[in-house]
């Protein structure tokens, strides 16, 4: 389970939004967890516990689950030279910075990026890391170490690129690898880190970067290896019209059709963005259980378009939520992303748009489904104790708590949550990270960032 046995009792929860199959909302209840698992929810529980919280006036929710990020981008946010670029030019410019990644940059960008997620109610993070400069060190191991330091549940990926500029791709030669190198390292990382057990704190997916930066052979071999090891598959797809035109010119087919020929559909696959799917492609996603991670802030910033989330939900396509990379968001708050998604889809029709509660379920149960997990994403007996608490007496929530299921999307929460709990352990206490020194970490991160950007 990742930690030694710990008992937690949260008393007097004003309202507990479970996001369970029955959409249950409990009032004035206690929650008891033992060894990271919820053992009881009910009034006036008499249970011994090492940690007891009084949650009177508190709203309680399942921990948010981030299903697409690029934590290494934390140190390339708000750069003036890329603010008015769209995806392809944006990537080409930033690769000249990212080619200098090392373990110090990855460690501190992971600590600060995941720390921000946790302070805003996130308890599980998936990161899509695909930039591996020669001689950079054990970048994925470094990410897992940072997650352990913070106490967050972590899904890393062995991303990859094998097409550089000389091959018709976008990245420089120094950050691409051969298919053989990638496959060997992928197997090593799965065998070293992937834990498929209940309550796992560490899992690994295989995640080639995108169809325009990897070869068909890399995609094919990644799918074969992932299924041999029973791990999941992830990549960017249908993010921009440029990608669609590139694939039509190179392969003579649309991106999803190309991916389907390589085995990249099914309930073990999820795509980031999925903006430009047509009607038939949405039906294929629904029929095969292939998922989509919605990243609205990034899609707006890069003028990529608006994913057809209302249509996906109607058809039964699995949908989760993600912040995307820190350089295209430019932040790491899934709470903010939840409200952004809610508002974005009301541009066309409030009647057709998903509700505030729909988006909460997308960010919890929906995201858990994309990661292939049924032990997180809702609050019920037998599930992992991943949750966050918000004091309903906050100034910004005055007059706003009549519908606790929707309030995170309709009104939003600007500052940090009061408590975040992962695996039955408090990881954010009174709005501050409980397991690291925030100021010291930020100070060290600024120094490393300045050196990194000054190269």
Where are these regions (language model features)?
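Alpha-helical scaffold segments that flank or form the walls of functional sites
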Residues: 77-128, 133-153, 183-198, 446-454
């Amino acid at each position: 389970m990742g930690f030694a046995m710990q008992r937690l009792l949260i008393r007097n929860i004003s309202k507990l939004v479970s996001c369970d199959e029955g959409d249950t909302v409990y009032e004035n209840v206690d929650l008891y967890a033992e060894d990271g698992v919820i053992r009881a929810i009910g009034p006036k529980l008499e249970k011994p516990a090492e940690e007891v919280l009084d949650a009177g006036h508190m709203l309680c929710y399942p921990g948010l689950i981030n299903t697409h990020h690029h934590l290494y981008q934390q140190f390339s946010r708000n750069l003036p030279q890329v603010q008015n670029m769209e995806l392809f030019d944006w990537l080409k410019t930033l690769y000249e910075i990212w080619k200098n990644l090392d373990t110090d940059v990855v460690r501190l960008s992971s600590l600060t990026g995941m720390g921000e997620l946790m302070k805003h109610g996130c308890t599980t993070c998936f990161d899509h890391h695909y930039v591996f400069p020669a001689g950079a060190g054990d970048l994925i191991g470094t990410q897992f170490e940072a997650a352990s330091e913070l106490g967050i549940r972590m899904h890393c990926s062995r991303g990859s690129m094998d097409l550089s500029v000389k091959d018709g791709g976008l990245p420089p030669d120094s950050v691409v690898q051969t298919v053989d190198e990638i496959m060997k390292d992928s197997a090593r990382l799965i065998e070293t880190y992937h834990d498929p057990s209940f309550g796992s704190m560490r899992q690994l997916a295989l995640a080639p970067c995108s169809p325009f930066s990897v070869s068909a052979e890399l995609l094919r071999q990644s799918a074969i290896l992932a299924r041999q090891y029973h791990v999941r598959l992830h990549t960017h797809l249908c993010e921009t019209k440029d990608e669609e035109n590139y694939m039509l010119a190179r392969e003579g087919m649309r991106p999803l059709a190309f991916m389907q020929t390589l085995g990249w559909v099914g309930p073990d696959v999820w795509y980031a963005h999925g903006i430009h799917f047509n009607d038939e492609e949405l039906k294929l996603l629904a029929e095969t259980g292939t998922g989509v991670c919605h990243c609205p802030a990034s899609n707006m910033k890069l003028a990529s378009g608006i994913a057809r989330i209302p249509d996906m939900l109607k058809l039964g396509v699995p949908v989760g939520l993600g912040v995307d990379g820190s350089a295209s968001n430019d932040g790491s708050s899934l709470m903010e992303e939840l409200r952004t998604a809610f508002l974005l889809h009301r541009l066309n029709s409030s009647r057709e748009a998903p509700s505030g509660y729909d988006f909460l379920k997308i960010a919890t149960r929906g995201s858990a489904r994309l990661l292939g997990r049924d032990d997180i994403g809702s609050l019920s007996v037998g599930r992992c104790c991943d949750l966050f608490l918000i004091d309903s007496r906050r100034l910004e929530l005055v007059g706003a708590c009549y519908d606790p299921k929707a309030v995170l999307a309709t009104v939003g929460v600007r500052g940090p949550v009061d408590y975040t709990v992962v695996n039955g352990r408090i990881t954010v206490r009174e709005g501050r990270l409980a397991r690291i020194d925030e100021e010291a970490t930020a100070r060290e991160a600024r120094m490393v960032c300045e050196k990194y950007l000054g190269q």
